[in-house]
């Protein structure tokens, strides 16, 4: 059922829309984590390091497509708020052609350059073969990732967040079952875990595409809608390209940090791989709430309801702050227990590094929570360039400080972890200053 975010109680409408979004991405994290848990438990620390380190690279690559889909989704939401069906269909057809072309190009580039990419990331020899095997299989699912994210963005733009959740739930359950079958039942190793992920992605991507075209007449396009005019290209470029840049810069920074982590060896790599999974799972709800907030703002921006946007912003800040305080306390207290999901109790060195990471970064989840709200807001009010600026501040600070601090012998690897919240908070300050300037105009 689609939710009209331009009318009715603000908090209730945002929560009804965001909860399936949050549940969906928690499921997505669950099936991402499934690879890591099963590989770490049954194939050992080197395999865990290989699969966990692959996650940073895959996140960077898929962030390009995700950014394009998110940017298009903001435009779809504005068109939906304007009740302009003709313009909406033009935007859908043109953006599909543009993003599909990028997905095909990206798939070809990464498949041909896997070896060079691993060398750039300074992957240790003992995990090189496993990481290459995993990536070569997982890369075949890039087009499936495009299909799911594109049609999920389209449905969410119309206030429909439950259907994407259903397809993601099927994908998550299937991935876990196939992981167990390939890795344990068939003894297929790292390649088996990758095949399980790819099969699940294709089923989810094709399924949601068929549903959207078949069951949503407002999105059923005519042949003439599949064309790219100068005006349509300009609008999609404005939203999608800058959102893509923002997502790519964010994940490129993470990828550069991954390269630095790799230089500390397999123990730190394995700890980082496990801790990042926990980290992502912990703040995923506020990331999804930020996306829901973006849809809320975009629909009301299209409808010209500025006061409703301000009310939604105030209430969203309080909701995010409350959630982050609870999650930060939980991660700090239960850091060891959470890491034991991924590693064995006797792997004490990995546990020590992972606990250090979670307790330094986890205290500051409110920083990333507010940042996701700023990202969503600026994307929705046609200021996606500001999201890029905030990302550059956050990730630039993180990367520079990570390299500088970790080079100090007395600080070492903990400097990489400390750089993260500093970047978040500096970006939040910049986002708030610009928000106040916009309100004064």
Task: Tell where the protein language model's regions lie, with residue ranges.
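Short alpha-helical transmembrane segments in multi-pass integral membrane proteins
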Residues: 1-18, 76-141, 185-241, 297-364, ...
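N-terminal transmembrane alpha-helices
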Residues: 5-42, 56-71, 75, 100-107, ...
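Transmembrane helical elements of multi-pass membrane transporters/channels
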Residues: 16-35, 137, 171, 200-204, ...
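Small-residue hotspots at the loop-to-helix junctions and early N-terminal turns
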Residues: 45-56, 135, 194, 266-281, ...
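Small-residue-rich hydrophobic transmembrane alpha-helices
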Residues: 48-108, 145-164, 271-335, 368-390
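Hydrophobic transmembrane alpha-helices of multi-pass small-molecule transporters
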Residues: 60-63, 175-179, 205-209, 281-284, ...
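Short runs within selected transmembrane alpha-helices of multi-pass transporters and secretion channels
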Residues: 69, 137-156, 164-172, 193-208, ...
């Amino acid at each position: 059922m689609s939710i009209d975010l331009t009318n009715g109680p603000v908090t209730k409408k945002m929560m009804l829309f965001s909860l399936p979004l949050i549940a969906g991405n928690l499921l997505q994290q669950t099936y991402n984590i499934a690879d890591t848990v099963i590989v770490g438990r049954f194939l050992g620390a080197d395999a865990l390091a290989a699969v966990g380190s692959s996650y940073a690279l895959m996140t960077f690559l898929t962030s390009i497509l995700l950014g394009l889909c998110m940017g298009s989704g903001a435009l779809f939401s504005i068109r939906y708020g304007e009740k302009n069906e003709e313009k909406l269909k033009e935007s859908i057809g043109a953006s599909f052609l543009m993003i599909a072309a990028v997905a095909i190009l990206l798939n070809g580039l990464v498949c041909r350059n896997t070896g060079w990419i691993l060398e750039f990331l300074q992957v240790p020899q003992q995990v090189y073969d496993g990481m290459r095997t995993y990536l070569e299989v997982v890369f075949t699912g890039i087009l499936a990732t495009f299909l799911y994210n594109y049609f999920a963005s389209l449905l969410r733009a119309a206030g429909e967040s439950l259907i994407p959740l259903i397809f993601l739930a099927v994908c998550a359950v299937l991935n876990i079952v196939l992981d167990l079958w390939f890795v344990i039942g068939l003894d297929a190793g790292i390649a088996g875990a990758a095949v399980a992920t790819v099969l699940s992605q294709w089923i989810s991507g094709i399924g949601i595409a068929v549903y959207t075209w078949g069951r949503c007449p407002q999105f059923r396009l005519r042949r003439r809608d599949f064309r790219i005019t100068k005006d349509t290209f300009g609008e999609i470029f404005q939203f999608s390209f800058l959102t893509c840049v923002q997502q790519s810069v964010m994940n490129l920074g993470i990828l550069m940090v991954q390269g630095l982590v790799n230089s500390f060896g397999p123990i730190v790599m394995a700890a980082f791989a496990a801790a990042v999974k926990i980290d992502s799972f912990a703040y995923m709800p506020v990331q999804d709430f930020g996306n829901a907030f973006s849809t809320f703002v975009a629909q009301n921006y299209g409808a010209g309801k500025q006061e409703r946007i301000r009310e939604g912003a105030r209430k969203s800040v309080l909701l995010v702050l409350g959630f982050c305080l609870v999650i930060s306390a939980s991660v700090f207290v239960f850091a060891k227990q959470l890491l034991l999901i991924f590693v064995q109790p006797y792997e004490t060195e990995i546990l020590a590094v992972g606990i250090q990471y979670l307790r330094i970064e986890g205290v500051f989840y409110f920083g990333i929570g507010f940042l996701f709200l700023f990202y969503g807001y600026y994307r929705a009010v046609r200021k996606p360039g500001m999201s890029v600026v905030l990302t550059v501040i956050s990730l630039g600070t993180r990367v520079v400080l990570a390299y500088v601090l970790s080079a100090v012998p007395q600080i070492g690897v903990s400097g990489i972890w400390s750089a993260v919240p500093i970047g978040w908070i500096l970006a939040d300050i910049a986002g708030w200053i610009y928000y106040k300037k916009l309100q004064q105009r």
